[in-house]
Amino acid sequence: MFTLKKSLLLLFFLGVINVSLCEEERDADEEERRDDPEERDVEVEKRFFPLALLCKVFKKC
């Protein structure tokens, strides 16, 4: 039982570290995007490209 608790605690700790690192990386990426408006436009194009493709394929716009 003690080893199970120890393992779960270790997994929880590693998960918390992973989440905090991901948040820091995401925040850094957002700061970079604010600096470069062209990069923001590319993100929007990437997001809407599949929708436009589906619209053309199924012709339900």
From Swiss-Prot:
**What is the annotated signal peptide range for this record?**
1-22
UniProt entry keywords in alphabetical sequence: Amphibian defense peptide, Antibiotic, Antimicrobial, Cleavage on pair of basic residues, Disulfide bond, Secreted, Signal
Q: Which GO terms describe its biological process?
A: defense response to Gram-negative bacterium; defense response to Gram-positive bacterium
Propeptide positions in the record are 23-45
One Pfam family it belongs to: FSAP_sig_propep
The SS bond pairs are: C55-C61
Q: Where in the cell is it found?
A: Secreted
**GO CC annotation terms, alphabetical:** extracellular region
Query: What does the record say about tissue specificity?
Result: Expressed by the skin glands.
* UniProt keyword Ion transport present: no
Concerning its family, UniProt says:
Belongs to the frog skin active peptide (FSAP) family. Brevinin subfamily.
What does the UniProt record say this protein does?
A: Antimicrobial peptide. Has low activity against the Gram-positive bacterium S.aureus (MIC>100 uM) and the Gram-negative bacterium E.coli (MIC=25 uM). Lacks hemolytic activity against human erythrocytes.
Name the record gives this protein = Japonicin-1CDYa
Q: Which organism is it from?
A: Rana dybowskii
